[in-house]
Amino acid sequence: MPAKVYVNRTLNMKKIRYIGLDMDHTLIRYKSLNFERLSHTKVIEKLLKRGYPDVIKSLQFDDNLAIRGLVIDRDKGNLLKLNRYTAIRASFHGLKPLDFKMHQKIYRSTYIDLSTGGYMAVDTFFSYSLAVLYTQLVELKDSNPNLQFPEYARIADDCLDAVDEAHRDGSLKEEVKKNLDHYIIKDPKMVEDLEKYKKHGKKIFILTNSDYHYTKLLLDYAIAPFLKEHKSWLDLFEFVITFAQKPKFFYEGNRFLRVNPADGTMTNVEDKLAPGMYQGGNAKQFTTELGLEGDDILYIGDHIYGDILRLKKDCNWRTAMVLEELEPEIENNAKAEPINAEIEVLMKQKEPFEDELTVLMTRKIEEGVVDDGKIEALQK
């Protein structure tokens, strides 16, 4: 299926002066299953150091167990699927779906408020493997009461801490660095498109939370080999801002440091921002010194909160989101169209029977006219 762009608000690209890109999972796409398996393995290693039973070594990453957009109920050990109104459409405990009666008993008329401490959003690629592992650990805890597992909420917190630690201590990225071909997608067409935008007068910048060394490594690997109209990715990108600390970049006043692209050494920025490579900084200084309004910038990212919601709230930049899960969702909806059409036909056939049942029930209540045999037949 060819990649497509969907909009929920009109976007006139002629008015966009700067196009900003997150790096990880946006400009540079990962081979998701390989990366999530790695993340799953690293988190298990860290949980073992925290005293979790050795049996968790046997757990294998299963990408069918979760998807971004779900919510973890920390206290009950459940994985929840919400609708657009934050009502709960489906729930799983461990590896098993809760049956309808149990689901209704626990969650009837419940609307999820993610600002409360009882729930954890699965809203990034990095939390995807966390959700998979959490469901597996809940299953192990329930099926092995003799093993020393913490309570459900503690398991969720430990998994989150372990994921954060794996990113913070560099253990994940060190593995990626050792085998870039196994984890990173090369996309020559994407590089060609970026050069085309640059040719048409758009200025392109990178805004990433990754550090200088990792950023340079990935850009050298996935961008530089496919450049045709630029000598270096430094010529393609007007600004490369590393270690940006998003979402704080959008609302705090951290200072910019200029980075020497050759060796990563940093110096203070004394003058106005000029094209080049930087660390840190803040959105207010970036837009003010470049003479930009919020809607002059289109920023593309993959993090619902860190890249999209907070950015819209604080800076009014135009935003776009990379949502890989949308592609199979659209494909599945297309495959289901014949079934949906059949259901629609059957629903129309059902309508006159429902109308007749309503009339009979009304007459029974209001006029005492009883035709229980026909009512029973219609209710079947």
Descriptions of predicted regions:
Residues 1-380:
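HAD-like aspartate-dependent phosphatase fold
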